[in-house]
Amino acid sequence: MNITIITVGKIKEKYLRDAIEEYSKRLGRYCKLDIVELVDEKTPDNASEKEEEVIKEKEGQGILNKIKDNMFVIAMDLGGKQLTSEEFAGYIDNLGVTGNPNIAFIIGGSLGISKSVLARANYKLCFSKMTFPHQLFRVMLLEQIYRGFRIIKGEPYHK
């Protein structure tokens, strides 16, 4: 299985980069992982709603340019479906079984994901109704993907 994480923004904090590196290494046993980092657009202080929408669409165009035609796209979105870890593992497993071995997870920037990217998404997933920094969320997503593969394989880790 090929997993691509397309994300807006760079990771500045060493402890987050270390965690990403650790989970990326662990995932190497289960899938080919590719993390694509896109430049986040600067949002001016007191930006209007229209200015924010323009920024989201610009970031969205960068995301769309990285999505390949054969990718099953899962957008991480507050309006998406919430799953348990077991349901998430089952969903990923089912994608592989049904001929979707190329999965792209999309993490938007601080303003979220553009309408054009949400329209391209095959599935919208929400981890929580809470808001998380997108840098931290990348670690959370990698951990859940790793947990999912451990569940699929029946290996100890998940409790």
Curated annotation (Swiss-Prot):
Q: Known CDD domains for this protein? A: RlmH-like
Give me the residues that bind S-adenosyl-L-methionine, please.
Answer: 108, 127-132
Q: Which GO terms describe its molecular function?
A: rRNA (pseudouridine-N3-)-methyltransferase activity
State the source organism's domain of life: Bacteria
Q: What class of enzyme is it?
A: transferase
Q: Which GO terms describe its cellular component?
A: cytoplasm
Output the Pfam families linked to this UniProt entry: SPOUT_MTase
User: What reaction does this catalyse?
Assistant: pseudouridine(1915) in 23S rRNA + S-adenosyl-L-methionine = N(3)-methylpseudouridine(1915) in 23S rRNA + S-adenosyl-L-homocysteine + H(+)
Its main subcellular localisation, reduced to a broad class, is cytoplasm
Q: Per its UniProt record, what Gene3D superfamilies does this chain match?
A: 3.40.1280.10
Q: What are the entry keywords? A: Cytoplasm, Methyltransferase, rRNA processing, S-adenosyl-L-methionine, Transferase
InterPro entries assigned: Alpha/beta_knot_MTases (IPR029028), RlmH-like (IPR003742), tRNA_m1G_MTases_N (IPR029026)
The subcellular localization recorded is: Cytoplasm
EC number assigned by the record:
2.1.1.177
User: What does the function comment of this entry state?
Assistant: Specifically methylates the pseudouridine at position 1915 (m3Psi1915) in 23S rRNA.
User: What family does the database annotate?
Assistant: Belongs to the RNA methyltransferase RlmH family.
Q: What is this protein called?
A: Ribosomal RNA large subunit methyltransferase H
